[in-house]
Design a protein with these regions (language model features):
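A short, proline-enriched helix->beta-strand linker immediately N-terminal to the Walker B motif
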Residues: 167-171
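ABC ATPase NBD coupling module
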Residues: 71-89, 115, 122, 238-243, ...
Length: 317
């Protein structure tokens, strides 16, 4: 993705500049985490890559989104349908709304196979479905093939969503906060499984979350977004150990440290601006404790601060 900007139509018809000059890369076999508060543009970014934004809601787009040899912004819906599910797939946040309550687990996971392999027999579809469910952590997949979503636990529904994404062995998996509704033990188990599957298959993973603690457990690289702008990116371990942007540092300070330091999270003062009320300069300037007059004159450029590390700040930490 290079220089990607997106303007959507608001509910009142006004244009909303949601994403601005977004630029990052996901390499083969790599797990890239995308972090930021709710409203930062993370999910819209994912929907843009997947081609799932309604055409009627898009006012303007600029830049490029490349997937291997494909320019995704040039594909029509029919061409995108051939790519979506087979070469790229998405794990959505809430399985009870993303899954069809009237379809069995076998039919829902197998639907993708039938769509991309029209000549596949039922036995061939079943083989793929069982393998995908096993990869997603079902110890005994055959036992649940006839189950409906309401008959599965929350953890099983999340695993079913993962199986639906993995069934065609896509090159890219996008996971949008897939463990939000689960308890800590299930989150760790599912994230570990997701990371192992991506690495074992040579797939790539884009993992979206507002929780840096969760992202730290699964990602190789970290992209931090604020108000539709990437403010910092780099190797996850380095960035977490020594953040350069005040917003990244504030997100890290917001993590609870109850075991070693025994202190509560430190909230970030203020609120995320709406897309039509972003500050004229740095998008974080209204909430930044380090803000100076120069920060309000224009959006800072992305500056390289080390190997594969970028920060969009005039006065990095």
């Amino acid at each position: 993705m290079s220089g990607y900007s997106l303007t959507l139509r608001g509910s009142d018809g006004r244009p909303l500049p949601v994403l601005q000059n977004v630029d990052f890369e996901i390499r083969q076999g790599q797990c890239v985490g995308v972090a930021g508060e709710s409203g930062s543009g993370k999910s819209v970014l994912a929907l843009s890559i997947m081609g799932l934004l309604p055409a009627s809601s898009v006012v303007d787009r600029a830049g490029s989104i490349r997937f291997g040899e494909l320019d995704l912004m040039s594909l029509d819906e029919e061409a995108f349908r051939q790519v979506r599910g087979s070469r790229m797939a998405m794990v959505f946040q809430e399985p009870m709304t993303a899954m069809n309550p009237l379809m069995t687990l076998f039919d829902q996971v197998g639907e993708t196979v039938a769509a991309h392999q029209p000549g596949a027999t039922r036995d061939e579809i079943r083989e793929r479905v069982v393998r995908a469910l096993r990869r997603a952590g079902f110890a005994d997949p055959d036992r649940f093939l006839s189950s409906f979503p309401h008959q599965l636990s929350g953890g099983m529904r999340q695993r079913a969503m993962l199986a639906m994404a993995l069934v065609m062995d896509p090159e890219l998996v996008i996971a949008d906060e897939p463990t939000t509704a689960l308890d800590a033990a299930l989150q760790i188990q599912l994230l570990g499984e997701l990371r192992r599957q991506v690495r074992a298959g040579g797939n790539s993973l884009m993992f979206i979350s507002h929780d840096l603690g969760v992202i730290r457990a699964v990602s190789d690289r970290l992209v931090v977004m604020y108000a539709g702008v990437i403010v910092e990116s780099g190797p996850t371990a380095e960035l977490m150990a020594k953040p350069a942007h005040p917003y990244t540092a504030a997100l890290i300070e917001a993590l609870p440290r109850l075991i070693v330091e025994r202190r509560l999270p430190r909230p970030i003062p203020g609120h995320l601006p709406s897309p039509d009320k972003k500050p004229a300069g740095c998008v974080f300037s209204d909430r930044c404790s380090q803000v100076r007059d120069a920060c309000r004159s224009g959006l800072p450029p992305a500056v390289e601060t080390g190997p594969e590390r970028l920060v969009r700040c005039l006065f990095p930490l």
